[in-house]
Design a protein with these regions (language model features):
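C-terminal folded domains that constitute the principal catalytic or ligand-binding module
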Residues: 195, 213-245
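N-terminal accessory regions of nucleic-acid-interacting proteins
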Residues: 32-102
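Short linear loop/turn motifs
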Residues: 2-15, 163-166, 226-236
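Short, flexible loop segments at boundaries between secondary-structure elements
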Residues: 200-219
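Conserved non-catalytic scaffold segment of RNase H-like nuclease domains
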Residues: 85-198, 216-224
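Short, conserved alpha-helical segments within structured domains
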Residues: 185-189, 209, 229-235
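Short helix-start
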Residues: 3-45
Length: 245
């Protein structure tokens, strides 16, 4: 129909419907006139607007895709950089310490759960619950771990003057080489203590694979603290002894 609105009549703008919230302007037939030339001009204007809108959406989509690719590339680069650093740290020469119990129960705290996260604290006790190490570690690359802080309560200030992993790797490695290493969550702990020649026995896997240390400790009446890494290592050892008898 070759009709257009009467000049100066704005019409009524409203949503198409609740599911397609796009504004459309409507006019009563009485508010329009027959004008083929103006209809042609209006159709051309709408076509140009639609094309411009489509080009803008396409450009925004491409920009978003590029941003995602760049972010993923940065993530991969961060993981590779950290892996190179950690591998170099654990390659250090170390002799096993004297450990007559033959057991090392270890617990760790980290900046998170992703491949680019780092150690914040390592604690270990021997089979008689004697402390072998309890050390804070300053992350080499990660400088923000708000989500992890809610769990482990280790702040940036807590590790500001702490040694880097490279400074304590030899000591940690010597301890881990001194006996049968156990941790409650082996897959998690191994990701951060990936020391050549060291295999970590997961206590959790000997139970059911999903019960947490806090829950199992309560079940057996074992003292437990979610923010004390040494307590976690001791609790892990006690659970291990119970399920091993």
């Amino acid at each position: 129909m070759d009709r257009v609105p009467v000049p100066g009549n704005p019409g009524e703008t409203r949503w198409n419907n609740r599911y397609c919230q796009v504004e459309t302007t409507y006019w009563n037939i009485a508010d329009t006139v027959v004008d083929p030339e103006r209809v042609k001009e209006e159709r051309e204007r709408l076509r140009l607007e639609r094309n411009a809108r489509d080009r803008k959406r396409y450009a925004e989509k491409k920009a978003a895709e590029q941003a995602r690719r760049e972010k993923e590339q940065e993530r991969i680069a961060a993981i590779e950089r950290l892996n190179t650093y950690v591998k170099k740290c654990w390659a250090v020469s170390a002799e096993p310490i004297k450990n007559e119990t033959g057991i090392v129960s270890v617990a760790v705290e980290t900046t998170g759960l992703d491949g680019y996260d780092e150690l914040l604290r390592v604690a270990a006790v021997d089979g008689d619950e004697r402390l072998l190490i309890d050390v804070m570690i300053k992350p080499r690359y990660v400088d923000y771990w708000r989500d992890a802080y809610e769990v482990n309560q280790i702040s940036r200030a807590d590790v500001a003057d702490a040694p880097y992993l490279a400074d304590v790797a030899a000591k940690i490695k010597g301890i881990l080489l001194s006996g049968h290493v156990i941790a409650y969550n082996s897959w998690f702990t191994e990701a951060y203590l990936d020391v050549p020649g060291v295999e970590i026995d997961g206590v959790k896997e000997h139970i059911d694979g999903y019960t947490g240390l806090a829950e199992i400790s309560e079940q057996y009446g074992i003292p437990y603290s979610s923010v004390n890494t040494v307590d976690k290592a001791i609790a892990t050892l006690r659970v291990y002894k119970i399920i091993s008898t």
